[in-house]
């Protein structure tokens, strides 16, 4: 039995999709365990670039089972659009499985998300307005509608009527806007459910059977540790748990069945949306990193904020996710910068801080303590081993591994699959 979890160690957008796609080649099953279609990942397969938001990266391998676990919230309309996107490009989706326990995003979740974000004014958290948060709210409040309900005409209508009575009061009384009628939603979304029905099953059984039969299972996280609702920069976070612990509740696979946890990070730091960002760059170097690294959101198109590599953040990710392996991406983006900086600690009110503060007022006041390293000018995009890296690039990579306390297993020097290099096999480690 071998199972590997891929976790983002920063604020998302670390290149998890590419690493998951790369590791998918040696897995029999690929599963997502949290989030929804708020997370975009770009994959290059067969020389073609694909942008996915909900379906696991392993979908391009028709012999591999791809699972959307119970921990996700699924917009049926968005899922069908993504299925069509793949079908139009000749990609089969017969290998997809969707949990019957996954919660469903409905039009009132999208509306609630938009209205709540607008009402916060300057205190907005930067939601993608995909209805993710409100759907998770309903799940916690025990009024959510699950995939199993969506497929049952009577159960779906009954739950929808109950929910709309409550949601419409919210829209009318709090936001002074019209709500929805049952007829507006019911037939359309019940039909979506019927189109998705062929994929829906108990995915916990699928995953545990695979592991019990010694198949390799890859768990694909979305977002990153710093966006985790418990361990991230709350409230500037997502509504689920991207950390490795999210696998257990989000798939129905026990923690003892997880063997390795790969932390994915970029050789610098980026984030979309609001919230403290200690190493953020507002200068020409920041602009260079953004443009060379194409730092624009896959889902929103928003320019990402960028900054120097923050080892405090990645050490935090190592601790809360139990990271066993490091995949360092986008090293090539730093080529040509004369002096590179790595944040080794924070300083606040004269005190050195080695951990990420829970209090965001303190984090906002933190100044990074930097260690400087010389850069390199050589083109490294064709490098295929650590030994081939220029001395300064190799020292930078080694220092990142030392400061984070995570063993380097993979590194990448460009966006293509063949630019991802294996230092050690995470399935056999």
Curated annotation (Swiss-Prot):
GO MF annotations in UniProt: adenylosuccinate synthase activity; GTP binding; magnesium ion binding
Entry-linked CDD domains: AdSS (cd03108)
Family: Belongs to the adenylosuccinate synthetase family.
Active site: 13 (proton acceptor), 41 (proton donor)
Biological role stated in the UniProt entry: Plays an important role in the de novo pathway of purine nucleotide biosynthesis. Catalyzes the first committed step in the biosynthesis of AMP from IMP.
Cofactor binding, per record: Binds 1 Mg(2+) ion per subunit.
Subcellular location: Cytoplasm
Main location: cytoplasm
Residues noted as binding GTP in the record, renumbered to the chain: 12-18, 40-42, 304, 330-332, 412-414
E.C. designation(s): 6.3.4.4
GO terms, biological process: 'de novo' AMP biosynthetic process; IMP metabolic process
Keywords, sorted A to Z: Cytoplasm, GTP-binding, Ligase, Magnesium, Metal-binding, Nucleotide-binding, Purine biosynthesis
Cellular-component GO terms for this entry: cytoplasm
Origin: domain of life: Bacteria
Name of the protein this chain belongs to: Adenylosuccinate synthetase
Broadest EC class assigned to this enzyme: ligase
Binding site for Mg(2+): 13, 40
Cofactor list: Mg(2+)
Pathway(s) of this molecule: Purine metabolism; AMP biosynthesis via de novo pathway; AMP from IMP: step 1/2
């Amino acid at each position: 039995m071998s199972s590997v979890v891929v976790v983002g160690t920063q604020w998302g957008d670390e290149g998890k999709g590419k690493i998951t796609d790369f590791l998918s080649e040696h897995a029999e099953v690929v599963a997502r365990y949290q989030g929804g279609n708020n997370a975009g990942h770009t994959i290059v397969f067969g020389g073609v670039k694909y942008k996915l938001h909900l379906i696991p990266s392993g979908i391009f391998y028709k012999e591999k089972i791809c699972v959307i676990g119970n921990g996700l919230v699924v917009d049926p309309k968005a899922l069908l659009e993504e299925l069509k996107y793949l079908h139009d490009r000749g990609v089969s989706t017969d290998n997809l499985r969707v949990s019957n326990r996954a919660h469903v995003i409905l039009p009132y979740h999208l509306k609630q998300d938009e209205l709540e974000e607008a009402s916060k004014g300057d205190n907005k958290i930067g939601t993608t307005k995909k209805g993710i948060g409100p759907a998770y709210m309903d799940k916690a409040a025990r009024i959510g509608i699950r995939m199993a309900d969506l497929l049952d005409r009577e159960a779906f209508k009954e739950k929808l009527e109950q929910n709309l009575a409550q949601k419409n009061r919210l829209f009318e009384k709090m936001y002074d806007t019209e709500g929805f009628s049952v007829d507006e939603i019911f037939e359309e979304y019940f039909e979506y459910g019927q189109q998705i029905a062929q994929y829906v099953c108990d995915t916990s059984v699928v995953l545990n059977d695979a592991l019990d039969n010694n198949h390799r299972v890859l768990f694909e996280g979305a977002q990153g540790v710093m966006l985790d609702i418990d361990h991230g920069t709350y409230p500037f976070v997502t509504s689920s748990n991207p950390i490795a612990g999210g696998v257990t509740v989000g798939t129905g696979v026990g923690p003892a069945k997880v063997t390795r946890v790969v932390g994915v990070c970029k050789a610098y730091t980026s984030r979309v949306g609001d919230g403290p960002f200690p190493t953020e760059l507002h200068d020409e170097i920041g602009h260079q990193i953004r443009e060379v690294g194409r730092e624009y959101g896959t889902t929103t198109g928003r320019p990402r904020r960028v900054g120097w590599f923050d080892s405090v953040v990645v050490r935090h990710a190592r601790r809360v996710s139990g990271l066993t392996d490091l995949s360092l991406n986008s090293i090539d983006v730093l080529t040509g910068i004369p002096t590179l900086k790595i944040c080794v600690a924070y300083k606040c009110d004269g005190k050195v801080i080695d951990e990420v503060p829970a209090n965001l007022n303190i984090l906002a006041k933190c100044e990074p303590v930097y260690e400087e390293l010389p850069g390199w000018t050589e083109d490294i995009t064709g490098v295929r081993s650590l030994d081939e890296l220029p001395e300064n690039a190799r020292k930078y990579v080694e220092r990142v591994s030392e400061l984070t306390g995570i063993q380097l297993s993979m590194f990448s020097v460009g966006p293509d699959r063949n630019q991802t290099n294996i230092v050690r096999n995470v399935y056999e480690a």
